[in-house]
């Protein structure tokens, strides 16, 4: 199984004319077994849940601060 990741396009100059060309770089990752794919899925779900947890914590802190501001009469 192969996973192709397209990286950002890079510019390079061709010859003495200085013609700018765009080409996309590709990173091809070859998964030899399904265990590597399962590990990648596990890691991506772990990072996603970590981001959601951080966003939820920040949202709760903001709501607490708004509640304090309203209760203090500002």
From Swiss-Prot:
Keywords: Early protein. This is Uncharacterized protein E8. It comes from Bos taurus papillomavirus 2.
